[in-house]
Amino acid sequence: MNQQIKYRNRYNSPKGITIVALVVTIVIMLILVGVTVTIAINGGLIGTAKDSKEETRYTQVLAEKEMWESEKRSTDRFGAKAETLEEFVERLKKEKILTEEEGKQILELGFVTIEKKDILLDGKRNVADASLWDYQLDTKTNFVTITRYLGTTDNLTELTIPNFLLIDGKEYRVTKIEGHDAWQAIANFNGNVIISKGITEIGKASFNGANKITGVEIPDSVTLISDYAFQYCRSLTKIRIPGSVKKIGNWWDNVNGQVFNGCSNLKEVIFEEGIEEISGRAFDSCSKVEEWNLPKSLKRIGQWAFSSIGVEEFNIPENVESIYASFLSSSNLVKVNVDSNNKYFTSVDGILFDKNITRLIKYPEKRGSSSYEVPNTVNTIDANAFISCKNLQTIVIADSVEKIGDSAFYGSKLKTINLGGGITNINNKPFYGALNLTNINVITENDKYESENGVLFNKGKTILIKCPPAIINGEVYEIPNTVVEIGPQSFYRSQIKNVIIPSSVKKIGSESFFQCYNLEELNLSEGLERIEWRALQQCNKIKTIVVPSSVTYIDKECFRSMGRINQNNDKKSWGLNS
């Protein structure tokens, strides 16, 4: 016959339970006399008791929960009848370990909330009728995700998102706001949104485009603000992000975060301690924020997280350990500072490097110098490292530098780049968007590359890698007769009018002359075999191209946006109709 084991009758429990009970009893006694005790459950740290009545009560709840679960496992094994959850809750309420409200939450939701003290203890219920909301009910957990507000916002100055929905007479806990553009229904709501405590996630694109809301109150129960959540909320002027939020966006290693992207009137962001990760483009175009006080807890900053902002100085706190290339751009930036206790990064004359000064990460856009020599400890220049530099005209790349990232000089006023001897693998990509370049020079000791009249070639000049866009303005450029291949994007956005291609050239690479808006004449010689993808796209001033009979391949996208092509059978002349 099954014997019911009373929860407090420790002596009738199996041996393992007696030991658990004894240990937990000692722990509780120590807590009650003021000793700090850390309790680990299932190998994980659950809570630390501090010198406060509320923390002691919280620890008691955890200890009682562990004992109850341990006894339940054992009694199930031996076929005995254990204390039910209802009996457990009722007993803890009588002993004033649990409040009435907390007991109700445990009975409704189980123990899933017990490790979230801010939800379990002294939480406030904001119950709303389900008729005002679109929602999704997870029947396994009984948790609700709110996806849309169905009511009217007329005459409202404040809208509260509830933490409980009344569905068919029963209350269900709301844990998440979700749904792409879920709040477009309040796009014209000119007021403050209050998210009730207990909601743990602000889902993807939840408030995207709700451009008239003036404020959002985020509770400290929220642990994740997902991608695009507040994108283009253009009336937001201030936001507080609680320390419970560990991640602002899901992706730090690409540009898909965009949590507050386009919040163009945002002036103040309060980051509380606890935040660890800021995703890609999280605060892109938040140009009115005058100071970014990042928390000490921050560990990772994503790609373009602070793109197109407006500050003169930017500070990296002490615990940041990962910074994605291209994390920062500001047209007013003069200086990047790094906390002296940071183990991973440093600043030299306002320029951001890794701690050992082997990686140049960020050169400020508005730094005053017209020339700069990269330190000889650096081996890598990050992508977009010199983006939009206004005053820099000449840069000397040290022999130690082996790699230059894509678009490293994009949008800058640079005229001259002097490459050292360490560069062993380079293409056109680092120079992409550097439209003011007139000269790319290579030190003669470089074994892989050389230059002639400011044009970059491989060693031996068989491949033309990059002709600087501003090297010749309105003149003719004749490619050396050693060249066999014109590399991809080699003349991209060049100002040149006429290019003469010798018979040695066999291949014109992808986008070689892409967007050469001034190019009027391109002379192709017999011997040319291939014209690749978009090679002449948007060269709108070219009227006629004479294609030699040696050509065996022309990509179908080659002449796009140049007018209709008349393809003669003999391929000798392709006339372009305006």
Report the location of each language-model feature.
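N-terminal leader/signal peptides at the extreme start of proteins
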Residues: 1-15
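N-terminal single-pass transmembrane signal-anchor helix
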Residues: 15-39
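Basic helix-extension-helix modules of the SAP/HeH family
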Residues: 36, 40, 44-48
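Membrane-proximal N-terminal amphipathic helix
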Residues: 45-80
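Intrinsically disordered, low-complexity repeat and linker tracts
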Residues: 49-62, 123-133, 147
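Extracellular/periplasmic head regions of type IV pilus-like filament subunits
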Residues: 70-123
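Structural signature of tandem-repeat unit edges
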Residues: 137-144, 154-176, 187-201, 211-224, ...
